[in-house]
């Protein structure tokens, strides 16, 4: 059983070849994406900053948080950002069998659709951890799995200046930048609001135009 479970989890990475990691390198475009929200305090501040800088991005929302804060979700959609499904509860899909995976994907999708008034366009697995049961659920929903090419802050805290420097160093045409507007990592939201203006300036300083995910892919 342990070996079978390991194959179920690890074997799914063969299927991530069908997922989207970046846009075309032929166009000077990039997209900012935000995971783990909505957060009732941080997400509105992020939306304010994006509006101030004239940027639209993509928010990968946790279903149960979307159900708790539907007003924030409606604002995300109303301001022209793409809405994505980040599962119902942010469980690692490596720890989910087929039935639990179905709940995470479909319940998340439905909760976000109800809060946003429109279905999610994309899906992103928590921590990038997929499984074999996930992909057959995404096709009928028409939600491709989208990961990222640049992650300024991953599982370890990174101060705003570090995040800006990583973006400047690693991003290029087609970049999908993965940011976090809720505290999956403690304090992530506060660090993001400090880093976001510098990230926008750094990417634009490289000649990149920041566009919604739907215009990048």
PLM features per residue range, with description:
Residues 34-36, 61-63, 85-87, 124-127, ...:
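A cross-domain feature marking catalytic cores of carbohydrate-active enzymes
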Residues 1-6:
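Hydrophobic core of alpha-helical transmembrane segments in multi-pass integral membrane proteins
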Residues 53, 79-83, 139-148, 173:
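Glycine-enriched alpha-helix->loop->beta-strand junction motifs that scaffold or abut catalytic
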Residues 168-216:
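Catalytic grooves of carbohydrate-active enzymes
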């Amino acid at each position: 059983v342990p070996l079978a479970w390991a194959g179920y989890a690890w074997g799914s990475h063969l299927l991530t070849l069908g997922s989207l990691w970046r846009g075309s390198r032929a166009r000077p475009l990039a997209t900012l994406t935000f995971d783990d929200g909505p957060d009732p305090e941080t997400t509105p501040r992020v939306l304010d900053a994006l509006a101030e800088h004239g940027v639209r991005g993509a928010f990968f929302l946790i279903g149960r948080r979307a159900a708790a804060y539907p007003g924030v979700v409606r604002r995300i959609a109303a301001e022209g950002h793409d809405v994505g499904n980040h599962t119902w509860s942010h469980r690692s899909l490596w720890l989910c069998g087929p039935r639990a995976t179905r709940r995470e994907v479909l319940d998340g999708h439905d909760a976000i659709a109800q809060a946003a008034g429109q279905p999610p366009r994309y899906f992103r697995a928590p921590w990038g951890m997929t499984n074999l049961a996930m992909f057959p659920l995404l096709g009928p929903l028409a939600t491709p799995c989208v990961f990222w090419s640049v992650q300024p802050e991953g599982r370890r805290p990174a101060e705003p200046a570090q995040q800006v420097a990583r973006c400047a160093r690693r991003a290029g045409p087609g970049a999908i930048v993965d940011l976090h507007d809720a505290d999956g990592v403690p304090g992530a939201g506060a660090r993001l609001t400090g880093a976001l203006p510098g990230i926008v300036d750094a990417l634009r300083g490289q000649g990149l135009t920041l566009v919604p995910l739907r215009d990048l892919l």
